[in-house]
Structures are given as structure tokens and as C-alpha cells.
Amino acid sequence: MGKSVAILGAQWGDEGKGKIVDLLTDRVKYVVRYQGGHNAGHTLIINGEKTVLRLIPSGILRDNVTCLIGNGVVLSPEALMKEMGELEARGINVRDRLKISEACPLILPYHVAMDHAREAALGKNKIGTTGRGIGPAYEDKVARRGLRVSDLFDKEAFAEKLKDILDYYNFQLVHYYKVEPVDFQKTLDDVFAIADVIKGMVADVTTLLHQARKDGVNILFEGAQGTMLDIDHGTYPFVTSSNTTAGGVATGSGFGPRNLDYVLGIIKAYCTRVGSGPFTTELFDEVGAEIARKGNEFGAVTGRPRRCGWFDAVAVRRAVQINSISGFCMTKLDVLDGFEELKICTAYKMPNGEIVEYAPMAAKDWKGVEPIYETMPGWSENTFRVTKREELPQAALDYIKRIEELVGVPVDILSTGPDRVETMILRDPFAA
């Protein structure tokens, strides 16, 4: 019988999901994106060659895998064509192996214009979006005014809807934000110059998934961003615009929650965050700078430096609750090599003196929160590219064990380098 496994970030994103998805895709028939858009940046390194995927599922690098983009993904036609072009230039067959739900909302130039205008207007209070139009596209979806992939099949009706939407957006862009309007004809022409390519990949993703389940094949759901950026459960309002958690699998693909067999949460051995928002264990000293340097902590999509801090078991406990996580993959263990001591945040001290073991929901409730740390000895030995558990230093094993105890979930996979081969699978999610 086939297994259905979801892989998602259990922190603030950038945990290393792309590598692990790619690692496990040799076991599956389908890899599915179910939320987000081209704001994701999944970095894969295979035999030393680096690939960054933003929209197309990471399974595209395996010839035997069919990649699906579910209805929960907001689709930029421009970004899709650019990414397809990059892959096809390397000889990768995308068009025959990528299927797209007709219910995907489209990201169009006015979404990007609005995203930039709003962030500029917010100034120092900006959310820290990637500026790719993700939020405005999801707004249109919820407001029931958005254009979807299915609208590409009728150009006349599409043009009529586009005109109404542009009137709405351009009024705000010109009169409120004082920026240039988006041109109707150029937008229409640009979309329909590539519409036929997209239409050729449209499929009933939900039916494909349920048939795959019946046929007993393995399916992998690839999450983007991280749990603490979820629109409902993250550090609101400093969040993304989609459900990054396990519940998003069902709503973003039409694959019911009872069909998931295993949820793999990806965690770094420390914590990072990009953009604004609360981050209790953030380090502002030389240790934080050294983690950032050794971990090469710069965003795959934006290039922005990531904020770095100690492992936060409080935030990860919340991720375990929300996602029903079955097991963890811990990445970047090797980045902690050489530190004399390491700290793990085990609880938060709230401004009123209360000690809590689960993270608050809203960003405002994190104000004045202090981390309570447990200090553990570090290790001087090298863990980079170690692929056998017994070859890890005892202090590293103790560190992993303590995290397992604090969050109540086992570490089933360990990553000790960026390449897919630099990994230990202690318990295979597809055999669990």
C-alpha cells in the first residue's frame, strides 16, 4: 500500500525542505505543492550542482516523478515560464511532468505593484514580504474577485474581468499610493502570450491524487515557508498569506486529512528568521554572526540575510501541536561544530512573570518575552558530511536527544551537509 507523506517547515521557513523533498522523491510517484507561490526558495545541491526552485515542486529533478501544483498555490505565469525555461535549458522535461490545478489563483502585475506600494508605505513597520504579489493574490481569492487558471480558457471573459480588477487596483495605486498604474493591454497581451503553455498542463489534481491513493503509489506533499509563518497559526501579522501547516495539504490539494500517513517536520539545529516579526532566541552577538556565516544564512529568493538564534523548543512544540508531526528531520547540525557551548530555549518568561511552554499566537503577545535557556556542551569534532549516526560526537547525540525530549517527537532524519547524499535516514517516513 502506498504512503502519503507531508514535508513542512516547523520553524520560520528556510529549514532545508527542498533538499529533503528531493532526497525522498526516489520513493514517490507524485510530488505536490499545495500552498504559497514563487516566494518559496527551495535550494537543491546534487553532485555539487545548485538548483533553486521557487514554484515548481522539487521532484522535477527526478525523471520518474510527476509534479502537481494544487489549488492552494497562487500561480505567477511569468515566474512559471521563467523557471520552466531555466530547467528546460538543462535538458529537464517539465511540460510532460508538471500538472496544474485549474483552480489556482493567478498572480498578475497589479498584485506585485500593490505589494511593493504597501510595503513602501508602511516604512519601518513593513511586514517584510518578498514583494512578489503573494498577499494581494490571496486577498483577491478570498474577496472572490481573483482570476484563476480556469479563466485562461476564455480570453474575452478574462479581459472583461481583468478590466474591472484593474480599475479597482489602479484607483488605489494612483490616488492612495501615488505610483504608476498598471497597463491593461500589456497585462492582457503578456498573459495570453503564454496562456497556451499553461493550459496544456492543466489537470484535475484532486482526482489524480485520489486515483494515486487507490493505485497504492507513494505521494509526497511539499510545504513552503514554515509553521510560524502560517496565516492563522503564525506570529500574526508577521506571517505569509497561506496555510503553511499540515491542514493546508487538504485545503490546497483536495486530498483529505485522513489520507496523510506521516508528517515530517523540518527543523534546523538552531533557528533563523527572514524579515520582520518576533524571534525570542535571536542572537545579536558574535555567536549569532558566526552561525550566520557558517550556515550561509541568506534567503534563496530574496538574498536577504537571515536573523539567527538558538534552538527554540517552545516554538517547535507549537508546531508539533498544529501539524501532528510524526517525526523530524534536523538540518545544518554541522553548523554548530566548534562552539564550546550551545543553548536551547525550553520555556518563555512572559512580562507578567508567568512561565509558559508553548508559543503565543499573536505577535503582540511576544512583546517582552524572555527565553529561558538550558546550556549544553558543544563539540569540537567535525560532523560535516558524516553519514553514520555512530560517527557523530557524543555531545551532538546528547544535543539531539535533549531536543527530542523537549518537543516529544523523534528526529528521524539528520542532514549534515547541503548535498542529498549528506544525510542519515534513521527512520524512513515511507516505511514508518
From Swiss-Prot:
Top EC class of this enzyme: ligase
SMART domains linked: Adenylsucc_synt (SM00788)
SUPFAM superfamilies: P-loop containing nucleoside triphosphate hydrolases (SSF52540)
E.C. code: 6.3.4.4
Major site of localization recorded for this protein: cytoplasm
Assigned GO CC terms: cytoplasm
A Pfam family reported for this protein in Swiss-Prot or TrEMBL: Adenylsucc_synt
Location of this chain's protein in the cell: Cytoplasm
Residues annotated as binding Mg(2+): D14, G41
Subunit structure, interactors included: Homodimer.
Protein name: Adenylosuccinate synthetase
Gene: purA
